[in-house]
Structures are given as C-alpha cells and as structure tokens.
C-alpha cells in the first residue's frame, strides 16, 4: 500500500484519476481510500489476488483505465504481465518486455553487460551446472566466493563459501533454496568482494533515445541481504568514481534498449573498483532519497515516458543538493528474532517538518495483515 499511496500523490498533483485494486485483507487500506475508485480483486493471499495478472487486467478494463503502474514487488518485474498489458491495449508503466526479460536472469544480464563493456565481478555466469565443474570454477576464482541463484532476489539463494571443502554442501543448499523460491535452481559463482559497498545508480530512459542517471544511492546497511538504510549521495564518493559509475549505468540501460525508471546495482570494492550486480527494472523502495537530493519527481517522469513524451530533464539539469537518509520501518518483533508482527496499529504519530518525509501505507486503527511484506513505512 505504501507505494500505491506514493503513486496516487503524484497522479493527484498532475490531475490523473486513479483506480486502486485491493484484496480482502486491504479492504480498508489507505491506498483504497486515497484513490478515486477501487476494485476488489480477490482473497488475501497474494497468489489469489495481487499476483493474478488476468484479474488485475479485468479490473483495469472494467474501470476504463488506460495504464497500470505496478509499483514494486508482485508483478512489477514480470515480463508476462507486461506483455499481457500490451496485448490488452493497456500501457504498462515500466520498461519494454525485452528489457525485463534480459534483466530477469542474472546470468543473461551479466553476459549482456560484459558485451557492453560494463565491469563484471570475476566469476562464472554460464550454463554448465555440473557441481564438479562449478567447484573447479570456484577453485580457479579463489575463495571466498559467492554462489547466487540466477533468478534470485530478496536475499534468497545466496551462499558465501570460504573454502573448497564447504563448496559442495553450500551449492546443494543454494540450489534447493533457489528451486523452492523461484522454481529455478540455476546458479552463478562469483568472487566474494571483501568489505564491499552496495552502491546503485538511478537511471531514466525515454523512447526517444535519451538516457540520464540521477546519481547514486548507498544501500550497504543490510541484514539478511535486505536493505535497511539507504542514503544519497554515497559517503566518500569521489567525483571521478561517481562519473564512472554513472556512465556505466547509462551504458547498461542503452545495452538493453531501456525505457522508464531503472536501477543499476554495483558492488563497490575498497580499492575503487566497481562491478555490475544486477538491474532492477522498476521503481525502487528507496527512490525517495534520490528525489530529496535532486528535486525530481521520479513517478512523474515515469508517467511522462509511459505517455510517449521525452524526459523533462537532461544530464546537465541533474544536480545533487544536500544529503538524504531513508530508514525502512517494519512491523517486526525484536524479541522474536525480528519476525513479522501483524496486528492492529493503536497509535501512529507521523513525523513532519522541514526536510522530513514520511512515506506510509498505514494509519492509526488499521490492522497489519500477515500476508504481505512487513515494511509499512519509510522515514
């Protein structure tokens, strides 16, 4: 609901009518109240509602919607859904289907980026999945290595391996987790960069050949391979490194014929080197920090591009001003290993004031349901 509320805010400012979709669990959700219209799409479990593309398309047709903004999560990076929107004559506010497909596989994405001259972490990104072969690749790369699910994300399907003796068990475990989480046990093996920083570049491209970057976000503060704090600009980033990473991200976007908002994620090593990790083909959770330091409404640019217009900005227009830090607020129980903690919100005071932004999908009195991600707000 948080991202739906965010999108509705820009649509309201631009005079665009909005239609919310909601499950049984979200019947009283904030985004349902904010939208001009709301359509019920099914039971609480996501597989029976928010992941059912045909039901969402039916809701769009019934309400007369011209476009669908997928937000993040659920169907936001689903090429099949983007294709179905196109076939139904409804604009998918996101990149072309081919770009989603190209970036959907980490192995295929790395091959494409390598061909475009974007720096890659030393490793094996090919199709041979024989355990003995992968072990030999790891031995040649040198430990520690990282085994990663090719179709992975959200911290699932990743194992750090520090010695040859531990490789076989880690590989088997990683493949099992990947198969269960993504239905695909294909993995890649890469050098594990010690003391790395997770730095990502926000890019935008239109359908007229224009590509710009909106500088970087540092997302190194994580737990369980998931981001907790994000900030822009990255502390200690030199102008030379910023320019090099920005240029590499723009090349990455051009290499896949990108259009819309995208994020190119890099691993940055202490020695100044940086390596392509993946490209997220959607609006990121942490996009507000970029908006705070550039003054650019990312959702508004998405809507411009989706309607066939050119970007409203050139690279020379993008200027960094100040510093922003975002903290994700999750409904979790710290006394129970930070497990998700559903329940009713009895009191909520939203912080406000100069240079303070609070993005939320909840209000006092609402119940946090157990069916979806535990993140409820961002400060």
Regions found by a protein language model. Name each.
Residues 247, 277, 296, 300, ...:
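Feature representing long, continuous alpha-helical segments
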Residues 316-373:
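Glycine-rich active-site loop/lid that clamps phosphate-bearing ligands
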Residues 158, 230, 328, 375-379:
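Short, hydrophobic beta-strand segments
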Residues 244, 296-303, 308, 323:
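Polar, glycine-rich mid-to-C-terminal structural blocks
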Residues 1-264, 268-287:
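N-terminal beta-alpha lobe that positions the nucleotide/phosphoryl donor
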Residues 284-297, 301:
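ATP-dependent carboxylate-activation loops
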Residues 34, 153, 261, 320-322, ...:
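Short, solvent-exposed loop/turn segments at the edges of secondary structure
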Residues 120-122, 261-262, 300, 309-316, ...:
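Acidic/polar loop patches that form or flank catalytic/metal-binding clefts of enzymes
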């Amino acid at each position: 609901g948080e991202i739906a509320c965010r999108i509705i805010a820009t649509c309201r400012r631009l005079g665009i009518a909005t239609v919310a979709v909601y499950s049984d669990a979200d019947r009283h959700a904030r985004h349902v109240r904010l939208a001009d219209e709301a359509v019920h799409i099914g039971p609480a479990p996501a597989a029976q509602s928010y992941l059912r593309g045909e039901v969402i398309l039916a809701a769009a047709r019934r309400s007369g919607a011209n476009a669908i903004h997928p937000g993040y999560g659920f169907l936001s990076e689903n090429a099949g859904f983007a294709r179905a929107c196109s076939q139904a004559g409804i604009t998918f506010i996101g990149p072309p289907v081919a770009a989603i497909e190209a970036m959907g596989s980490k192995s295929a994405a790395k091959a494409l980026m390598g061909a475009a001259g974007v720096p890659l972490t030393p490793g094996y990104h090919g199709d041979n999945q024989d355990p003995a072969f992968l072990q030999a690749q790891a031995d040649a790369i040198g430990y520690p290595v990282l085994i990663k699910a090719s179709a992975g994300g959200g911290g699932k399907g990743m194992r750090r391996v520090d010695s040859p003796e531990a490789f076989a068990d880690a590989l088997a475990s990683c493949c099992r987790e990947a198969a269960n989480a993504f239905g695909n046990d294909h993995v890649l093996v890469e050098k594990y960069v010690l003391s790395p920083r997770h730095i990502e570049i926000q890019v935008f491209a239109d359908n007229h050949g224009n590509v710009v970057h909106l500088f970087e976000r540092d997302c190194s503060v994580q737990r369980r391979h998931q981001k907790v704090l994000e900030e822009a600009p990255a502390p200690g980033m030199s102008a030379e490194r910023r320019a090099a990473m920005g240029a590499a991200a723009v090349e990455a976007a051009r290499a896949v014929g990108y259009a819309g908002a995208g994020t190119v994620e890099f691993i940055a090593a202490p020695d100044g080197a940086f390596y392509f990790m993946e490209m997220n083909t959607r609006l990121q959770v942490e996009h507000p920090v970029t908006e705070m330091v550039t003054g650019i409404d990312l959702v508004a640019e998405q809507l411009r591009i989706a309607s066939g217009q050119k970007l409203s900005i050139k690279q020379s227009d993008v200027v960094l001003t100040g510093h922003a830090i975002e903290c994700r607020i999750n409904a979790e129980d710290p006394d129970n290993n930070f497990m998700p903690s559903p329940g009713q919100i009895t009191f909520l005071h939203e912080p406000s004031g100069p240079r303070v932004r609070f993005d939320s999908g909840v209000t006092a009195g609402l119940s946090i349901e157990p069916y979806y991600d535990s993140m409820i707000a961002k400060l």
